[in-house]
């Protein structure tokens, strides 16, 4: 047998950008470690500087960064972090981007438009990333944009476990805010024990971002507690209008459940006054005090991320984390 055999052990390292350091700390805590010390700041002209304060040579490094407000700044910071790790001889670099930046720009709606999600995936690869990890991509097909493994995690188990404590499945309905996400709603219905399905028919003008018109409900929601599910809440317009349509159609009450709480612009006002009994999101993105309101519940995503990171580090199966959900992992 040729070659050299060493007794060195693999070392798992978690590093964090400045967008949501609390999430990285929670992930590290779940893994029984600490976030690697680093220095990061912006120069007067806006350029970003990053340096890691410990050696990462030969390490399996997971770079955690959220991409909410200032998405371009945080994306650039994460790219610079990956570049620094590559030049410092990290053995493997996994980008952990729970809310993948530019995920909604995954195809061309009109001529002369970019496919920005593909561009971002290419940038990660060029910077030196070996692997990506995200939660609830806008479309699963985006995994094909990256030349390497992309672990697509699902927050559904986290959300469903909580929603079970908030509704009677025997008198509930799972509702998609549009026809395009009916498959997600179907998985929710199965997890809740086969509750009825419905969706809100809506139209959208692709030339006017963040605007849609909710028209009518397709399905039986009268007298039922409706669970309105989506991947994200941005300005809240789609969700607020859907809640109103459901209540006007005779729903007993409405609970909103979404993975990513972007909560841009008028979202807080819209969601707090739309009539929803509760709005549930995870902390894939930081939600400051100014964006919190009485009906909002924020669930931790760190345990799920930590389990996936441990599976990757141990060369295990990430897909097995979702065997009971009926979705394809990585």
Regions found by a protein language model. Name each.
Residues 1-330:
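PRPP-associated nucleotide enzymes
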């Amino acid at each position: 047998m040729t070659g050299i055999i060493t007794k060195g052990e693999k070392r798992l390292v978690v590093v964090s950008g400045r967008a949501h350091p609390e999430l990285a700390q929670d992930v590290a805590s779940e893994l029984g470690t600490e976030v690697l010390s680093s220095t990061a700041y912006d120069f007067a002209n806006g350029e970003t500087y990053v340096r890691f304060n410990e050696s990462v040579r030969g390490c399996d490094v997971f770079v955690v960064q959220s991409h909410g407000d200032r998405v371009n700044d945080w994306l650039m910071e994460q790219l610079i972090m990956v570049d620094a790790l590559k030049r410092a001889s990290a053995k493997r670099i996994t980008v952990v981007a729970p809310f993948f930046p530019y995920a909604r720009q995954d195809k061309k709606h009109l001529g002369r438009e970019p496919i920005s999600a593909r561009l971002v995936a290419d940038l990660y690869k060029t910077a030196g990333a070996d692997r990506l990890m995200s939660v609830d991509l806008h479309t699963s097909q985006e995994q094909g944009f990256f030349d390497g493994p992309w672990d697509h995690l699902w927050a559904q188990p986290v959300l469903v476990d909580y929603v079970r404590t908030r509704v009677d499945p025997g008198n509930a309905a799972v509702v998609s805010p549009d026809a395009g996400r009916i498959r997600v709603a179907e998985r929710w219905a199965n997890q809740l024990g086969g509750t009825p399905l419905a969706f809100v028919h809506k139209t959208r003008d692709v030339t006017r971002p963040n605007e849609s018109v909710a028209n009518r409900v397709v399905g039986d929601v009268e007298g039922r507690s409706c669970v309105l599910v989506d991947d994200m809440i941005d300005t809240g317009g789609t969700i607020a209008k859907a809640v109103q349509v459901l209540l006007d159609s005779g729903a007993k009450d409405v609970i909103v459940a979404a993975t990513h709480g972007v909560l841009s612009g008028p979202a807080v006002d819209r969601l707090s006054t739309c009539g929803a009994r509760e709005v549930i999101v995870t902390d894939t993105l930081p939600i400051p005090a100014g964006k919190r309101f009485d009906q909002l519940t924020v669930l931790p995503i760190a345990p799920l991320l930590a389990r996936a990171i441990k599976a990757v580090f141990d060369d295990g199966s990430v897909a097995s984390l979702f065997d009971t959900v009926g979705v394809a992992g990585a």
